[in-house]
Amino acid sequence: MNIQDMILTLQKHWSNEGCVLMQAYDTEKGAGTMSPYTFLRSIGPEPWKVAYVEPSRRPADGRYGENPNRLYQHHQFQVIIKPSPDNIQELYLESLKALGIDPLKHDIRFVEDNWENPSLGCAGLGWEVWLDGMEITQFTYFQQVGGLECKPVSVEITYGIERLASYIQDKENVFDLEWTDGFTVRDLFLMAEYEHSVYTFETSNTDMLFELFTTYEKEAHSQMDKGLVHPAYDYVLKCSHTFNLLDAKGAISVTERTGYIGRVRQLARKVAKTYYEEREKLGFPMLKEEAASHE
């Protein structure tokens, strides 16, 4: 099964479970969790079901396209359901079956791996899902997002697309993976992998990046003061990516690193609080919609 068919299969499976199929969010981020479809929607009491593919940029993992397993940008298939259904593990195993992986014929293990994202003030109880000894999915019950306690708890399922495809297609080099008929990951992404690695480690202007971080930080605070959550959060994401670029280039010392993470966390907490307050002013409208649908 090629990657395109994998994605279509997962979309169909989770769509059948009532998930909204969203498209990737258009601002750089290090993980699918950072999308507003997850970060913001996990806050507050309103129900939410979503599935989407998210390109995830990790500048420090760039290897000029020369490493068979490390990528500047990989892809995650993200599922968020709030509140978490009792049969979520069963639904997940059914999704593997849809991909041609029979849980009865493979060694599938849930290995405890509690999750934390300090820069976003997020934490949760979690498990890595191992398929015949290789991690393919992260399973997390959110306890805290943006420093706020999650009530009700959301469940997040994050499939590593390239990693899962490596298993399904039995390929050792990620660039050999078939994306769709006639196109490999090498065809689609190798040039960008090389160029982003050159930029990250060699040609980026660190003085400009430091200035951008401060500018983005100010703008995030400014928009939150006006109650504009989504523009503010875009700038939080930009701060995070800019920090990752500086960190990957070694431009930030160990002591400075803690301070920068703290500044991003402060922004994320402020966004989370503002989002909750703004939804509360609206009377948490999706709660009313859910109640109406059950009448």
Curated annotation (Swiss-Prot):
One of its GO terms (molecular function) is catalytic activity, acting on a protein. The keyword Nucleotide-binding applies. The keyword Transmembrane does not apply. Signal peptide: none annotated. InterPro entries: aa-tRNA-synth_II/BPL/LPL, Gly-tRNA-synth_heterodimer, Gly-tRNA_ligase_asu. GO terms for cellular component: cytosol. GO terms for biological process: glycyl-tRNA aminoacylation. Keywords: Aminoacyl-tRNA synthetase, ATP-binding, Cytoplasm, Ligase, Nucleotide-binding, Protein biosynthesis. It comes from the Bacteria. It holds the Pfam family tRNA-synt_2e. It is found in: Cytoplasm. Its EC number is 6.1.1.14. It catalyses: tRNA(Gly) + glycine + ATP = glycyl-tRNA(Gly) + AMP + diphosphate. Disulfide bonds: none annotated. NCBIfam families: glyQ, PRK09348.1. Belongs to the class-II aminoacyl-tRNA synthetase family. Tetramer of two alpha and two beta subunits. HAMAP family: Gly_tRNA_synth_alpha (MF_00254). This is Glycine--tRNA ligase alpha subunit. It comes from Bacillus pumilus (strain SAFR-032).
